[in-house]
From Swiss-Prot:
Span list, region Disordered: 22-97
Main localization (coarse): nucleus
Species name: Neosartorya fischeri (strain ATCC 1020 / DSM 3700 / CBS 544.65 / FGSC A1164 / JCM 1740 / NRRL 181 / WB 181)
Extent of motif Nuclear localization signal 2: 62-69
Localization (cell): Nucleus, Nucleolus
Protein name: Ribosome biogenesis protein nsa2
Domain of life according to the entry: Eukaryota
Length: 271
């Protein structure tokens, strides 16, 4: 819907605020008020999430869930856009000398990405691991039954993991109604104290993923960190290079302590 203004211009009905601001200007404290309103938004969202009940709470959580998924997708798309491609957009028509040929093509990102994929494709079993045998963990010890159901609480299909876990940055929770395995935030670890056996140094490195949990394939899928688990860590800080001169980014390590007792993850690098 549009309306005709005095000058003969068409204007949408929802643009009257912009028209008023063009004619009369803004309040002197307009920018400050906008800044404060935006700063209060997160507090308002938190208050609604904690205090809404019933159908309103359900609809609000669905809305927030969809917003978070879209935000994660936007962030991921932005990060992928920032990575340089290995091939140039158009081949240059002007001839270049030999020593300048490699400057026009950004191959580092592609090489690192390929190296990481190759590393992940390898089997962890090919390494001589420091802990060849570990004690088994029963499902009763690993999972705590969470009773659900309106009023009666008779349903017992949900499980809470009682051991430390690793959850990737791209993980998006399912709606609460369909979430079978709950991984508490207090038991999630992102870094490990990794010891290099040859260099004799211990460094705190970010965990990239769980390669294999010796207890159960399900525990591997859930990212459970127990003694003897093979994890992949980011070793770019150590400055390791391959024989061809490429930077080593991801490397496997085995957890040597009991994280749920110690409150930290200690591991030995597999070299």
């Amino acid at each position: 819907m549009h309306r005709l203004l005095r000058g003969g211009h068409l204007q949408s009905f929802h643009e009257y605020i912009e028209r008023w601001q063009k004619q009369h200007g803004k309040r002197l404290d307009h920018d400050e008020r906008v800044r404060k309103r935006q700063a209060r938004e997160s507090h308002k969202q938190s208050q609604d999430a904690q205090n809404l009940r019933g159908l309103r709470a359900k609809l609000y959580q669905q809305k927030r869930h969809a917003e978070k998924i879209q935000m994660r997708k936007r962030i991921k798309a932005q990060e992928e856009k920032n990575v340089k491609s290995s091939a140039p957009d158009e081949p240059s028509k002007t001839p270049l000398p030999q020593y300048l040929l490699d400057r026009s093509q950004a191959t580092n990102a592609k090489a690192l990405s390929s190296a990481i994929k190759d590393k992940r494709a390898e089997k962890a079993a090919k390494f001589a691991v420091p802990l060849p045998k570990v004690k088994g963990i029963s499902e009763e010890e690993m999972f705590k039954v969470v009773n659900t159901g309106k009023k009666t609480h008779k349903k017992s299909w949900k499980r809470m993991i009682t051991k430390p876990t690793f959850v990737g940055s791209d993980f998006t929770r399912r709606p609460v109604k369909y979430e079978r395995f709950i991984r508490p935030m207090g038991l999630r670890y992102k870094k490990a104290n990794v010891t290099h056996p040859e260099l004799g140094v211990t460094v705190q490195l970010p965990i990239l993923g769980v390669k294999k949990n010796p207890q159960n394939p399900l525990y591997t899928q859930l990212g459970v960190l127990t003694k003897g688990t093979i994890i992949e860590v980011n070793v770019s800080e150590l400055g390791l290079v391959t024989t061809s001169g490429k930077v080593v980014w991801g490397k496997y390590a085995q957890i040597t302590n009991t994280p749920e007792n110690d409150g930290t993850v200690n591991a030995v690098l597999l070299v």
